[in-house]
């Protein structure tokens, strides 16, 4: 029996953090700012990551319209891109095209340099926004990896390599889960539930995000209110409330209210609240170009905002999802991973991803700032996120979509 590669993907959006944001702005746009020109590598792949994020979201939304969705396009793409370093022929082409890259238009070296710069930027220390990523390579002690693959994943993706005895499945599982738990500060536990004894390699990626609102909510203003899951289901949720100046507007193209909220640091959250019966229209119509415009054209207005506290997670088996995007060979006996090892043929037997999202009044930590705003005398309009909505988050310096999700029921954890 051919050996198999066991591949786990992990994402965490940190506790007490608001997750959402806008997808990547086209890096090739004319009139790019000086800031854009200073970060060409990650900006070149940003539009592709944005397209990949929306494609992946639509596959997940098509499979179920009754469950919460939450994932990190960056985390999944990073794991696939690093894996591609060891793939050849159709297996390689499928991964690159599934990620939204056309190798006749973009040099593969530029793609990997883009991910390398993305990693370096995301892992830079920031006193206001905590954002860290990590890549782990767990290698069976009997497996001989090709030096080029090992050096490439270490140099380009900063992967840490660990010797693992996969014949002792419990110990191997513990080793991988401990790495993940430590990297996500205890927020993701037991990512890997089962390991195949034939596994010889595990590729793990995680991302941890923790931030504070630039404009926090008052805890005393949070009250129990109704959230309408669908036409027949209503649940009670703690609803945060704040009257003030927000970057909120109505988008007729999407038939949705659009709310943008900044974190202290370098990230922005975008929430999209569709009109009654317009959720599928929003999902079908939204594009990276539309989201990029939201980031550019930001105007504040006075509103009475109601927003639910959240603590949701998304766990998925990526194999059927990626298969829908045309990435099939790597999971089958057609897999060509001969760039990883010259030993027995490999295939991907497991592809796991988990994400956690928590939203509360102040962000990750209590915020001590006080905000005084000038308000008009007239009563501001009310915007109430009391039915299913979409959420996206972007990291500004890389223009990368860190997280994408849909909140259907805030009470489902």
From Swiss-Prot:
One of its GO terms (cellular component) is extracellular space. Inhibitor of serine proteases. Its primary target is elastase, but it also has a moderate affinity for plasmin and thrombin. GO terms for molecular function: serine-type endopeptidase inhibitor activity. The record marks 377-378 as: Reactive bond. Belongs to the serpin family. The keyword Nucleotidyltransferase does not apply. SMART domains: SERPIN. It comes from Ictidomys tridecemlineatus (Thirteen-lined ground squirrel). Pfam families: Serpin (PF00079). Keywords: Glycoprotein, Protease inhibitor, Secreted, Serine protease inhibitor, Signal. Residues 1-24 form the signal peptide. Glycans are attached at residues 65, 102, 266. The keyword Signal applies. PROSITE patterns: SERPIN (PS00284). Its main location: secreted. The reactive center loop (RCL) extends out from the body of the protein and directs binding to the target protease. The protease cleaves the serpin at the reactive site within the RCL, establishing a covalent linkage between the serpin reactive site and the active site of the protease. The resulting inactive serpin-protease complex is highly stable. InterPro entries: Serpin_CS, Serpin_dom, Serpin_fam, Serpin_sf, Serpin_sf_1, Serpin_sf_2. It is found in: Secreted. Residues 368-387 are annotated as: RCL. Gene3D superfamilies: Alpha-1-antitrypsin, domain 1 (2.30.39.10), Antithrombin, subunit I, domain 2 (3.30.497.10), Serpins superfamily (2.10.310.10). This is Alpha-1-antitrypsin-like protein GS55-MS.
